[in-house]
């Protein structure tokens, strides 16, 4: 029979009493007054911070956006269908943040950085705040390195530098996303990490972009952040900041990044929906008063960091959709004033078969030739001038039938230059190929060809020069200058190919 020893029992009880730690946790809680349309009104939560995450009893997370005298307005990061009036809510004491790591490359994630591509969890040891302050003046340096898009019209006349913010603006179906995805494809082998943020788009459109990047091996250095049209407004509003946080992670690790926001009009609409439901006073076009700050705090995070911080960079290409070419609407004017230039895509040019449909006349880069290599500067100046003169003459020629020979020649040259700016989608050109193409056009080598023959000739010329005059590309790649030697190789190559092409066409 087991004997019960009182001293042993009392010792065990004493030990337990000594080990007992009386912990008091204070939780800031509140009660749901009203819920609906992705918004909840909470009574209580007295010490909640603006932008703090709050957790509902059934697990939904929300963000406290409106701090009013008698209640707190919370936007929900989910449908919130299970939230009931009178249920409890607790403040988490955290501001929205996401995990970040190299493992995100090649993945498709949502605004909360959770994978949505069905390829399992993403391991990450660090995290970053979704909203973090932009680098200050001392932390930056001026933009000086080119970020090649692979599109002749942009790289020659509207150059983009690493750390710049260049707006892509145009009506729907004018090729805005195509310009952005071509730029991602052209970063292959350039040591640039790309982040593509899809806001409020059709899931089929996002899938198309991802497939096109995968087929060409571009997903290896790309992260896709997607919140489709059926996502809650809160997540559509957060998606660009999530993308920026991921790009910043790489930028502060001395790497170059490119981020595309497709598109900010949809983000502004999601924010307008949230603000109106929170009963914030509407302003112009019913947008809230702080919609400028919504975009400025996002785009100011793009920067070229100083040498002390490792010279990393984050280049932003925000996309904005206009309604029938109206760039004077509220969101377009806001974003134009925040960015360092804009690429304007025109529906008329697109329908006329000029693709990419870039209106060179009103597109501008405020960084300019600082973001070009010397060889490109040498050939691009003449191209700009001749196209500007051609645009003027073309408008004038519509009213006049008898034009002198010089004017006719200039019009013919302009038509051929316009032809050389045309490019197929997903076929970006290297900077050496662009230089040889522009040089051929501006020096009159295309004048003897029919307009319909120009593109065929240029394709053959690029192949011919690559195989028979590799010295040209080597000189440009090493010196970044169109030297006299490189020019002589180029002239010989063009001359030889032109003779071959004309013979071939005669047969």
Curated annotation (Swiss-Prot):
Q: Which InterPro entries match?
A: ATP_synth_asu-like_sf, ATP_synth_asu_C, ATP_synth_asu_C_sf, ATP_synth_F1_a_nt-bd_dom, ATP_synth_F1_asu, ATPase_a/bsu_AS, ATPase_F1/V1/A1_a/bsu_N, ATPase_F1/V1/A1_a/bsu_N_sf
Question: Which reactions appear under catalytic activity for this entry?
Answer: ATP + H2O + 4 H(+)(in) = ADP + phosphate + 5 H(+)(out)
Enzyme class at the top of the EC tree: translocase
Residues bearing Phosphothreonine are 257
A molecular function GO annotation: ADP binding
Q: A Gene Ontology CC term for this entry?
A: chloroplast thylakoid membrane
Q: What is its main location?
A: plastid
Q: What is its EC number?
A: 7.1.2.2
Where, in this chain's numbering, is ATP bound? 170-177
Q: Give the record's membrane topology.
A: Peripheral membrane protein
Which keywords accompany this UniProt record? Answer: ATP synthesis, ATP-binding, CF(1), Chloroplast, Hydrogen ion transport, Ion transport, Membrane, Nucleotide-binding, Phosphoprotein, Plastid, Thylakoid, Translocase, Transport
Give a single Pfam family match: ATP-synt_ab_C
Q: Where is this site: Required for activity?
A: 363
Function description:
Produces ATP from ADP in the presence of a proton gradient across the membrane. The alpha chain is a regulatory subunit.
Recorded family membership: Belongs to the ATPase alpha/beta chains family.
The protein's assembly and partners: F-type ATPases have 2 components, CF(1) - the catalytic core - and CF(0) - the membrane proton channel. CF(1) has five subunits: alpha(3), beta(3), gamma(1), delta(1), epsilon(1). CF(0) has four main subunits: a, b, b' and c.
Q: What protein name is recorded for this chain?
A: ATP synthase subunit alpha, chloroplastic
Organism, by scientific name, is Crucihimalaya wallichii (Rock-cress)
